[in-house]
């Protein structure tokens, strides 16, 4: 599956212009095929179904 990867709080992995190599690394560490910085967050391709991705209908992002 494709989507924005999220961290433990449910927030997207933030990125900035020029950080596509960092996003690609984070995506492949999660067993995705590749990824890039779709500013302001990392977008991944080919993620396994077990990896949680951002869902705007069920956004649990918090600052806690």
UniProtKB/Swiss-Prot annotation:
Keywords, in A-Z order: Disulfide bond, Ion channel impairing toxin, Neurotoxin, Secreted, Toxin, Voltage-gated sodium channel impairing toxin
GO terms, molecular function: sodium channel inhibitor activity; toxin activity
The keyword Secreted is annotated on this UniProt entry: yes
InterPro entries given in the database record: LCN-type_CS_alpha_beta_dom, Scorpion_toxin-like, Scorpion_toxin-like_sf, Scorpion_toxinL, Scorpion_toxinL/defensin
GO biological process, one term: defense response
Keyword Disulfide bond attached: yes
Summary of the tissues where the protein is detected: Expressed by the venom gland.
GO (cellular component) term, any one: extracellular region
Cystine pairs: 11-61, 15-37, 23-42, 27-44
Pfam family, one: Toxin_3
Compartment(s): Secreted
Segments forming domain LCN-type CS-alpha/beta: 1-62
Domain topic, free-text comment: Has the structural arrangement of an alpha-helix connected to antiparallel beta-sheets by disulfide bonds (CS-alpha/beta).
General function of this protein: Inhibits the sodium (Nav) currents in an apparent irreversible manner. Produces small depolarization and induces repetitive firing in squid axons. Is specific for arthropods (crickets, triatomides, crabs and squids), but is non-toxic to mice. Shows antibacterial activity against both Gram-positive and Gram-negative bacteria.
Entry's family note: Belongs to the long (4 C-C) scorpion toxin superfamily. Sodium channel inhibitor family. Beta subfamily.
Protein name: Toxin Tce3
Organism of derivation: Tityus cerroazul
């Amino acid at each position: 599956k494709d989507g924005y990867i999220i961290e433990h709080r449910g927030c997207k992995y933030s990125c900035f212009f020029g950080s596509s190599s960092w996003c690609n690394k984070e995506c492949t560490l999660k067993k995705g095929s590749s990824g890039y910085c779709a500013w302001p967050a990392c977008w991944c391709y080919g993620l396994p179904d077990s990896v949680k991705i951002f869902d705007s209908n069920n956004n649990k992002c918090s600052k806690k």
